[in-house]
């Protein structure tokens, strides 16, 4: 008789966690960034100051999509800044903030699918015209959103119980 190979034993603990990827995409489609991340001076302000996100000018009512899957941390209104805003936590630990919205279509705790519509472009709060203010935060600190757009992030997949 031919020799029989011993059974193969799975050693998942050595293989590491199962992973998958998420991709951050532009929250407004078809419109360019008109105000970049970093120091800027607005015509209505005396001094330059840090701009902690990017602005994407688009017509009032243009759809805004989540940059990646995640869960809504909070929504609200900030009269002195963001106006109507949404903050989302993503599986890679980053958070995104969408400001100056004319309408919010999600609520705190909602789970979001990739590129799900979450609201509409507006000009609420401290704003000079319709646009989306978009921020990305890592460990609570703002990072340049253009550094994460169209970038793939590998995340661990939790085993099902």
List the predicted regions and their residue ranges.
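Catalytic cores of peptidoglycan-degrading enzymes
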Residues: 22-160
């Amino acid at each position: 008789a031919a020799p029989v190979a011993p059974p193969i034993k799975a050693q998942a603990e050595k293989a590491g966690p199962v992973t998958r990827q998420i991709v951050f995409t532009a929250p407004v489609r078809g419109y360019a960034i008109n105000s970049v991340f970093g120091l800027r001076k607005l015509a209505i302000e005396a001094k330059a100051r840090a701009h902690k996100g990017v602005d994407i000018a688009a017509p009032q009512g243009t759809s805004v999509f989540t940059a990646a899957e995640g869960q809504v941390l909070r929504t609200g209104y900030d009269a002195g800044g963001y106006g109507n805003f949404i903050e989302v936590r993503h599986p890679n630990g980053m958070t995104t903030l969408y400001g100056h919205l004319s309408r919010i279509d999600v609520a705190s705790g909602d789970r979001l699918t990739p590129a799900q519509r979450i609201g509409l472009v507006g000009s609420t709060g401290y704003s000079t015209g319709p646009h989306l203010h978009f921020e990305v935060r890592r460990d609570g600190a703002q990072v340049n959103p253009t550094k994460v757009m169209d970038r793939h992030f590998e995340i661990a997949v939790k085993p099902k119980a």
